[in-house]
Design a protein with these regions (language model features):
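Conserved N-lobe ATP-binding subsite of Hanks-type protein kinase domains
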Residues: 32
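Conserved N-lobe beta3->alphaC-helix segment of eukaryotic protein kinase catalytic domains
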Residues: 44, 48-74, 89-92
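Conserved HxN/HPN-centered segment at the entrance to the catalytic loop
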Residues: 75-85
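Activation segment signature within eukaryotic-like protein kinase domains
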Residues: 129-130
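Catalytic-loop of the protein kinase fold
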Residues: 141-158
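C-terminal lobe substrate-recognition/regulatory segment of protein kinase catalytic domains
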Residues: 243-289
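C-terminal intrinsically disordered, low-complexity extensions immediately downstream
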Residues: 312, 316-369
Length: 369
């Protein structure tokens, strides 16, 4: 891992004033994201501000990771980092240099599109979204990279319907050796059960769980498991996917938190039953069932998911450009009203705080890009 004090090698522009900021489209603990335009070329871009609050620590590790990984990943379904811009140190910024990551501009994120009831996805268009998402995952996993923050807000879509995986601040390289990665990754509502139970030797299956959550969201229009705490999230997972036991998931009893957390007992698996009210396609339900497998060793991988019958029977995947051409305004989660909670679960006995879908229970991971 590159030390924090080492600067990244990437095309640099000397001054961020070459861009005119047009609108703020994102906000989080990482800073702000702006839609901007190159004053000379008129190219529209997205500028992600990198917070440099503690310069003694050097370049922030999340931004450094994102830059390093995006230098390697070049694919139609991965957001393209164009350059890095520095703002000059002035009295206005307390003589602290501000850094911006400049990305290609995508008109929408998936969470923003799903927040708008006027945006209607046909089954064929949902297939196209998921096909592109899984193709992006297949590409990064083939290059030994884990995304580790799969969620609808991190799925960007251009006005012509091209899908881009974005926000690689939590991404990292992985190997097939025994590893000890942090399990404090992935936004809570999309976090797979193995991470919630303390697994540190994980792989691409964590991203496929997130893909399953996002796929279900294409019909429910809201995150399907909105836990308030890790315990609550495990309860919701058990209610949908069945009780977590060594019988259905061999080896789970070895995970650090398996005996320390009270897990619901006697829960039957109800993925197809609970989602059938939204998802009428039998092939879609079958793929969802495979993506939301509790056991990561049995969870379908991106290659097998792309070969699933869901994508190869009528209606075949259909480009999104015609549907999106009816919507002239950009749609981002940051700019959208809260989405309603998806009523696919019976709520647990303890009272829960009802949070809008735009709210992230893990503030550390709240990002748009």
């Amino acid at each position: 891992m590159m030390p924090k004090t080492e600067e990244p090698t990437y095309p640099l522009c000397p001054d961020e004033t070459k861009y005119e900021k047009l609108a703020k489209i994102g906000q989080g603990t990482f800073g702000e994201v702006f839609k901007a335009r190159d004053k000379k070329t008129k190219l529209v871009v997205a500028m992600k501000k990198v917070l440099m609050e503690n310069e003694k620590e050097g370049f922030p590790i999340t931004a450094l990771r994102e830059i390093k990984i995006l230098q390697v990943l070049k694919n139609d379904n991965i957001v393209n980092l164009l350059e890095i811009c520095r703002a000059k140190a002035t009295p206005y910024n307390r003589f602290k240099s501000t850094v911006y990551l400049v990305f290609e501009f995508c008109e929408h994120d998936l969470a923003g599109l799903l927040s708008n009831p006027q945006v209607k996805f046909s089954l064929a268009e949902i297939k196209k979204v998921m096909q592109q998402l899984l193709n992006g995952l297949y590409y990064i996993h083939s290059n030994k990279i884990l995304h580790r923050d799969m969620k609808a807000a991190n799925i960007l879509i251009t006005k012509t319907g091209k899908l881009k995986l974005a926000d690689f601040g939590l991404a990292r390289a992985f190997s097939d050796k025994l590893n000890r990665y942090t399990n404090r990754v992935v936004t809570l509502w999309y976090r797979p059960p193995e991470l919630l139970l303390g697994e540190r030797n994980y792989g691409p299956a964590i991203d496929l769980w997130g893909a399953g959550c996002i796929m279900a969201e294409m019909w429910t229009r809201s995150p399907i498991m909105q836990g308030n705490t890790e315990q609550h999230q495990l309860t919701l997972i058990s209610q949908l996917c069945g009780s977590i036991t060594a019988e259905i998931w061999p080896g789970v009893e070895k995970l650090d938190l398996f005996t320390k957390i009270e897990l619901p007992k006697g829960q039957k698996r109800k993925v197809k039953e609970r989602l059938h009210g939204y998802v009428k396609d039998q092939y879609a339900l079958d793929l969802l069932d495979k993506l939301l497998n509790l056991d990561p060793t049995k969870r379908v991988n991106s290659d097998d998911a792309l070969n699933h019958d869901f994508f190869w029977v009528d209606p075949l995947p259909q480009d999104l450009n015609h549907m999106l051409s009816r919507h002239s305004k950009s749609m981002f989660e940051y700019l959208a009203p809260p989405r309603r909670r998806a009523p696919i679960h019976q709520q647990p006995q303890q009272p829960g705080v009802v949070r809008p879908a735009g709210h992230n229970p893990d503030q550390h991971f709240e990002r748009i890009f």
